[in-house]
Amino acid sequence: MSDIMYPVCFDTLMNHIFKEYALHNRIFNVESIHRYEGSNTLSAFGVTMENPLGPAAGPHTQLAQNIVAAYVGGARFIELKTVQTMYGEELGIPRPCINSNDEAYNVEWSSEYRADEAMNEYIKAWFAVKLISKEFGFGDPTGFIFNMSVGYNLAGIKDPLIDGFIENLKKAGATQCWQSCKEWALQNLHRFTNVDAAYVESISDEICQSITLSTMHGCPANEIESICEYLITEKKLNVYLKCNPTLLGYDTVRELLDVTGFDYVTFDKHQFEVDPGMNDAVPMIQRLQKVAEGIGKQFGVKLTNTFPVTIGHGELPGEQMYMSGKSLFPLTI
């Protein structure tokens, strides 16, 4: 299997969806397609979601087809794979980089695509979901949210590459990728039953009005607060801060993992010493909530980031890996 990803053009993406759905009543091998027929919804950032569930930023939200698969499987809040100034081979990601035999571990981090390439994947996914939700009756075409994710420091986020990524996902209509998707839809109207030119023209190009900040383990509290304030006040975005499980403190984390059957997971105290603690986080969150409220935006937290643990049995290459999945759940709640 190749470890190099190649993007799929929008024409190929849509042709695959149409053909697979017509022949097998599935999309990207998702057979239990979710059709929303209820009346219970949840509002966030002025958008009404059909449900608040969806994938976190990860390899499964890195490609357009994976995002489409998440949507047809029922996801309605989709956190896009984190981008930063580094990408591709520069990240130095060893292979394999994910072990999910039981609880999950990884040694990967941000998108392997350059930020502008990642942006194109997210635009294609947005446009595809807008089309298939309407055409196949999967749900309200406005009933889902894309949430972009950036990292890992203020200088990197202000870099023109990442700034362009943010601005273009806030309003994508001027991008070449958006224009290509729109042109394809208008040229293929004969293949649709429930989509017409007026609907295509009405598709909102405001893909992301919210953002999740991911910071490196060990990032100081004042740096985190500065980034969040910048994203709120300068970028005019609703912001989620991804918090680390280390907020709980070493003793609490050790006890929770022990009593829930994960006593074999090993880690040291160093990470707890360099990460912000609860005494730093709570007042910072309260300050940022006030900043957001002052300009009509929302600030919240995402629980939680992955948890750094020791590689002790060759699970993955290297000395440290990041834990997620069911073993992270007791720390999160």
Tell what function each PLM region has.
Residues 22-36, 249-333:
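Glycine/Thr-rich beta-alpha phosphate-binding loop at enzyme active sites
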Residues 59-61, 84, 243-249, 305-309:
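Active-site-proximal loop/turn and secondary-structure-junction residues that shape catalytic pockets
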Residues 55, 241, 301:
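Conserved, mostly hydrophobic/aromatic
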Residues 1-234:
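N-terminal capping/small domains of soluble enzymes
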Residues 219-236, 240-253, 268-279:
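Extended, H/D-rich, highly charged conserved domains that either
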Residues 168, 203, 226-237, 280-299:
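A structural motif corresponding to the C-terminal end of an alpha-helix
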